[in-house]
């Protein structure tokens, strides 16, 4: 199963999946990507 959550530390619109993934990894998640019409950074990991 994959868990997803909005990044707590990512600021502004998400334009780069790479930047989002780096922020998520610093928060202890496996990675992340830009998602949805508002381009939020969503963190993902196995759970």
Curated annotation (Swiss-Prot):
The keyword Disulfide bond applies. SMART domains: Knot1 (SM00505). Coiled coil: none annotated. Keywords: Antimicrobial, Disulfide bond, Fungicide, Plant defense. The keyword Secreted does not apply. Disulfide bonds join 3-47, 14-34, 20-41, 24-43. GO terms for biological process: defense response; defense response to fungus; killing of cells of another organism. InterPro entries: Defensin_plant, Scorpion_toxin-like, Scorpion_toxin-like_sf. The record marks 11 as: Interaction with trypsin. Belongs to the DEFL family. Inhibits protein translation in cell-free systems. This is Defensin-like protein 1. It comes from Triticum aestivum. The lineage of its organism: Eukaryota, Viridiplantae, Streptophyta, Embryophyta, Tracheophyta.
């Amino acid at each position: 199963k994959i868990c997803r959550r909005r990044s707590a530390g990512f600021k502004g619109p998400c334009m780069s999946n790479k930047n989002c993934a780096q922020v998520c990894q610093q928060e202890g998640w496996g990675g992340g990507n830009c998602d949805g019409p508002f381009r939020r950074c969503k963190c993902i990991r196995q759970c």
